[in-house]
Amino acid sequence: MESGHQNKYIPWLTGFILVVYISPLIIFGQDSHVRIHDNIEVNLILLKLLAESGQIFGQHDAIIPNLLNGVPRSAMGSEFNVMVWMVYLFGPFPAYLLNQICIRVIAFFGMYFLLTRHLVGKDMKPLASGVSLAFAVLPYYSPVELSVASQPLVLSSFLLIRRGLDRCTDWLVIGLIPFYSSLYYAFIWFILAMSLIWVYDLINKKKFNKKLFGAIAMMSTVFLIVEYRLIYMMIFNSGFTSVRTDFINNTPSVPPFFYGIHKIIIKTLRNFALGGSFNNSLQTFFIIPSAIIGHLILFDRRVKEYLLPFSSGLIFLSCLGFATYQSGLLTPLKEKIYFINIFHPYFIFLQPLLWFVVFALSLKLIINYVRRGTLIASVLISLQVLYGFF
């Protein structure tokens, strides 16, 4: 995938493929096939009811009718959320279509910027374009908006700020993404990860990175403002019991220890190999084999590439943590510590970002160290993109 005169056509090709991917929604309109991940949380219906209620700016205890015999306004997203206004201004399906377009476009460019600026370099733009396209056609859980799709873009901005190479656009990304994403589903864990990077710099490099600290504080503050209704629900008793809370309160009893360990092992391996419904990275058939080859190259050639095994390890640990949370072994702890129940282990929403970092780094090693590596990488990327279509 070395640079050449044909590379100038790659952006046009990837753009065309993205248009083809989205085109059924445009051509067939409301007759299109739409994937529904979770019937309990079809957010377009909830937002439609909110828009029709006239309570977008309502008080916390204002009642939204026609849903569970009425729910308080604080149980739904705040008026600072972009998706609320998409549904209000354009209606459910146009809002869904616009949301899908934004997700795909930002996913592509965010991953492209992350790869070319920080991971594979600008001399491998075709590789970056292909991996970014595969990332853009993942089956995203649309109710979380840009919570997953924007992570590469936000990470790229944070890394530039960390290195002191930031521009105004990087601060705009960090300041604006909270209006179109979810703190609860993904970004609380993303912010925690950035905080750990800041602590690492503080301890290992003896450096108080003011800009990185400021960026973390800025994004956290904006999220707290955008999600103020969620914060209100956490702190004050509204008298409303959500489906999630009711489900948690009926958590099964603690299983026998060894049976619980068995469940953890099986679920960890299954999540690692197959992924989940809401955070599916489509890693099974092409990304994992690429990662295996990449790790074999590291072992055989003694290549100093620490990010690949580190990212793979993080994925495995997240699968292990999620399986442990759901095993039942933590039930006594959940009953005693309220916040464990509130913050479901949605660090799994970081997995698509990590899997595609692993994919890109593995393909880079294949290109550099395997005979006909460029051809192999091209085939793997093409198959992964095709897999995303189905």
Region annotations inferred by a language model:
Residues 126, 364-389:
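Signature aromatic-anchored transmembrane alpha helix within multi-pass, membrane-resident enzymes
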Residues 109-117, 152-164, 194-202, 290-298, ...:
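Transmembrane alpha-helices and membrane-interface helical segments
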Residues 19-108, 145, 236, 252-262, ...:
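Membrane-interface coil-to-helix junctions
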Residues 108-118, 123-203, 215-232, 384-389:
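Membrane-embedded helix bundles of polyisoprenyl
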Residues 1-28, 125, 211-215, 377:
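Start-transfer (signal-anchor) and selected internal transmembrane alpha helices
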Residues 138-146, 304-368, 390:
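Membrane-helix boundary/interfacial segments in multi-pass membrane proteins
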Residues 13-19, 207-231, 246-250, 312-315, ...:
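Hydrophobic alpha-helical membrane-interfacial segments at the cytosolic entry of transmembrane helices
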Residues 227-300, 345:
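Periplasmic/ER-lumenal interhelical loops and adjacent helix-loop junctions
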